[in-house]
Curated annotation (Swiss-Prot):
GO CC, alphabetical: membrane
Protein name, entry field: Putative zinc transporter At3g08650
Disulphide-bridged cysteine pairs: none
Transmembrane feature ranges: 25-45, 102-122, 129-149, 155-175, 198-218, 230-250, 261-281, 289-309, 354-374, 383-403, 405-425, 465-485, 528-548, 552-572, 585-605
Key word Transport present: yes
Example GO molecular function: metal ion transmembrane transporter activity
Single Gene Ontology BP annotation: zinc ion transport
Superkingdom of origin organism: Eukaryota
UniProt similarity note: Belongs to the ZIP transporter (TC 2.A.5) family. ZupT subfamily.
Organism: Arabidopsis thaliana
Keyword annotations: Ion transport, Membrane, Transmembrane, Transmembrane helix, Transport, Zinc, Zinc transport
Keyword Flavoprotein: no
């Protein structure tokens, strides 16, 4: 082995020596390519010797009794062939997960990237926000590069990671030089320097998806099989959403439509499923290339952030705004990665099941929002009626759980009223403070239109949004209880998504009705319902990761219920002043809708086993 390595080194250096004589005659881009090749070859030769020496010493230590027939006598005295050992491991791991399962899960993981473009269907960016978005994109890309470097170091030699970083930076610099030589570049109706930057950003994010796809494939082929692969897939799917947001922000800040931004965000993640399947089938081979690939993608992103993305951000926003946006983005991404890492290092099958089930808790509010918007558009429901519906539902949600606790003697009247008063006081104080601050700013600006969202920011709209915030806090408290229950579900109780979705349906209806009545925008109503739907799963996942129990959750729930009452009292007062009859009818409809949904949830839990582990908060 050493003789072959020396011969290979001599041949390569002979060729390089002759090639160097012609470098002076080459173009500048060719010189860079030769330099990149030279750097790669030098590190390759060094690592070849190091790996060969490590392999020999490792074999001597691991199997000193090795015979000439490739038979190894292990520590237990059992004689096995190396071929049988390797084939046995591969057969064992591949029998656990099918190729189609890996392909379907990774396709869904890649599609999650498109969710990052959803906000731009409802928001138009002014120049200052475009600069802040570029700062956020820079933070996301930097955080992704940190994770790539760490992942590469975990899979092999740090030398390959360093080589990949340098090679990636050199590669992206050469690509920029080549694009500039072609003159004006156009893409998605963008021309000139902006088009060049868009091409580079999309290309870099696509390159870095190769490493993530191979990592997912290798995780499915690991010793823990499907459970480990599922957790890694879910982690990267959640991780893909802010990365899709980063790509969409770069595109939207340059005038690209939301549809195209979503399409290109998904395209940047398509290498994940394309690489995951081969990586699953050839896990050992892909593991050896991961360190260089992750370092290469990290080097590309670091160079692009410093050379292109941040300078563009500084043109539109102040340095403090850009720095704050980038820092918050990095901190958020690293916090997300830390949570998933801690979970994957110490988990069991129950946690994995609860983690997966928790993602489905948002279906109820989303369906409620869709139902409300469809009804409002079809029957041309008036604003007063819609606000009355929202208030009626909120009053039922605010009183349902406190009455359960009181009637079951799990909480006394005085503590219950005290917690409701605390929630109401906090809600009133927060709403009053925000309305006063916003009112002073409006009086100085002399405008009632927000240039960022194009939605009227009148007192009516602000009160409606604050009321939706109270519903969000209620969903968060309920999600904590669901997260405690999800890992303990058994039998048909694993399907408690049915009662939970039915329980959450009036919440989405209330939010969509409130927003639609205030803004007359079905886009905003659906977005608000979807956002409230996300609060429950995120809260449930957080409780699983934190490992909390039921103690104290009823108190949090009662405080959240108290916050609903004053918020929607203002909404119903406004609806009655606008049109007394329709506001009153809407409130009655809302009360009836909420009572019917919650009663049916109770009946499902009483007469089916779907709620055998669900908390009382959703029964």
């Amino acid at each position: 082995m050493f003789v072959r390595s020396n011969i290979l080194r001599a041949l390569i250096f002979t060729v390089l020596e002759k090639t160097c004589l012609e470098i002076k005659m080459m173009h500048s881009s060719c010189k860079g390519l030769v330099l990149l090749l030279f750097l790669f070859v030098v590190v390759f030769i060094g690592n070849t010797d190091a790996n060969a020496q490590w392999e020999v010493s490792h074999k001597v230590r691991a199997s000193p009794h090795e015979n000439m027939g490739r038979n190894v006598i292990d520590g237990s005295g059992v004689e096995k062939t190396l071929h049988d050992i390797g084939m046995g491991e591969k057969r064992g791991t591949h029998n656990k997960v099918s190729v189609s399962t890996v392909a379907l899960f990774t396709l869904a993981m890649a599609a999650a990237t498109g969710l990052g473009a959803v906000p731009f269907f409802f928001v138009e960016l002014d120049p200052q926000w475009a600069g802040i978005c570029n700062g956020m994109a820079a933070g996301v890309m930097l955080a992704a590069s940190f994770d790539l470097v760490k992942e590469g170091q975990e899979h092999g030699s740090g030398n390959w990671v360093v080589t990949g970083i340098l090679a990636g930076a050199l590669f992206i610099w050469l690509c920029k030089q080549i694009l500039e030589q072609y003159g004006e570049v156009s893409m998605l109706d963008i021309k000139g320097a902006d088009a060049t930057k868009v091409v580079l950003v999309i290309g870099i994010m696509t390159l870095h998806s190769f490493g993530e796809g191979s990592g997912v494939g290798v995780s499915f082929a690991g010793s823990k099989g499907f459970s480990q692969g599922l957790l890694v897939t879910l982690a990267i799917a959640v991780h893909n959403i802010p990365e899709g947001l980063a790509v969409s922000m770069v595109l939207a800040s340059r005038g690209v439509s939301p549809q195209n931004a979503m399409l290109w965000s998904i395209i940047t993640s398509l290498p994940q499923p394309l690489v995951a399947v081969p990586a699953f089938l050839c896990a050992d081979a892909f593991s050896k290339f991961l360190p260089f690939c992750t370092g290469f993608a990290a080097g590309c992103m670091i160079w692009m952030v410093i050379a292109e993305v941040l300078p563009d951000a500084f043109k539109e926003a102040s340095p403090s705004q850009v720095a704050s946006a980038a820092t918050i983005s990095v901190a958020s991404m690293e916090a997300l990665s830390t949570l998933f890492e801690s979970f994957t290092h110490d988990y069991n099958s129950e946690d994995a099941s609860g983690f997966f089930v928790s993602l489905l808790f948002g279906l109820g509010p989303l369906l409620g929002g869709v139902f409300l918007v469809a009804s409002a558009v079809t029957f041309r429901l008036q604003h007063a009626l819609l606000m009355g519906v929202a208030s009626g539902i909120a009053f039922v949600l605010g009183l349902w759980r406190p009455l359960q606790l009181l009637l079951s003697a799990k909480m006394g009247l005085i503590p219950l009223v005290s917690l409701l008063a605390i929630g109401a006081g906090l809600s009133h104080f927060t709403s009053s403070t925000i309305l006063n601050v916003t009112g002073r700013k409006k009086s100085r600006a002399g405008s009632l239109i927000n240039p960022v969202t194009n939605f009227p920011t009148s007192v009516i709209t602000l009160q409606s949004l604050l009321a939706c915030g109270a519903v969000g806090f209620h969903a968060l408290a309920e999600g904590l209880a669901l997260g405690v229950a999800a890992p303990n579900a058994y039998g048909l109780g694993r399907h408690m998504v049915l009662p939970v979705s039915l329980h959450g349906l009036p919440r989405g209806t209330a939010v969509a009705s409130c927003v639609f009545g205030a803004t007359d925008s079905w886009h905003a109503a659906l977005a608000a319902a979807a956002l409230i739907g996300f609060v429950g799963p995120i809260s449930a996942i957080g409780s699983i990761l934190a490992g909390i129990d039921y103690s104290g959750l009823d108190h949090v729930m009662v405080v959240a219920c108290g916050g609903l009452l004053p918020s929607f009292w203002q909404v119903i007062k406004r609806a009655v002043r606008l049109e007394r009859r329709k506001g009153s009818v809407g409130m009655v409809l809302g009360l009836a809708c909420a009572v019917v949904c919650l009663t049916f949830t109770r009946l499902v839990c009483l007469h089916t086993p779907y709620c055998n582990s669900a908390p009382e908060a959703v029964r």
